[in-house]
């Protein structure tokens, strides 16, 4: 999906997602669109790595930003699910992130289970 279409979807749904799920302990997170996770982290726009084609979105609790990797978005549903998933992480207790990551596999992590469950609400925002 290209950056323009992704941005249109974000413009249509993000305020609804914020209203539905409410505000967390931090200000509402900004959303930023990026081509690649490695390019974003390195500052080199051409950088790629093993997760370049699979990373869809990421919430960074230190910067309070949701990063969307638009080339990996398949369709509108994918964009909405990704925003909901990362917004759920914004709302969660950030102190538990590392603790749970050390205790559980990704699929057994209660933080990830909640985020995946919330993704099922995606049709509410169309």
Where are these regions (language model features)?
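Auxiliary, metal-adjacent structural segments of Zn-dependent hydrolase domains
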Residues: 2-66
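Post-HEXXH active-site segment of zinc metalloproteases
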Residues: 77-81, 92-124
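Histidine-centered divalent metal-coordination motifs
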Residues: 85, 89
């Amino acid at each position: 999906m290209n950056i323009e279409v992704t941005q249109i979807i974000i413009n249509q749904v993000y305020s609804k997602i914020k209203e539905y799920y409410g505000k967390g302990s931090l200000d509402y997170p900004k959303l930023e669109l990026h081509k690649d996770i490695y390019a974003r982290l390195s500052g080199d726009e051409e950088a790629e790595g093993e997760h370049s084609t699979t990373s869809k979105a990421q919430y960074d609790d230190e910067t309070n930003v949701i990063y969307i990797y638009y080339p990996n978005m398949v369709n509108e549903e994918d964009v909405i699910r990704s925003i909901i998933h990362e917004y759920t992480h914004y709302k969660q207790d950030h102190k538990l992130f590392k603790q749970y990551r050390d205790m559980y596999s990704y699929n057994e992590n209660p933080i990830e289970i909640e985020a995946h469950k919330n993704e099922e609400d995606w049709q509410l925002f169309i």
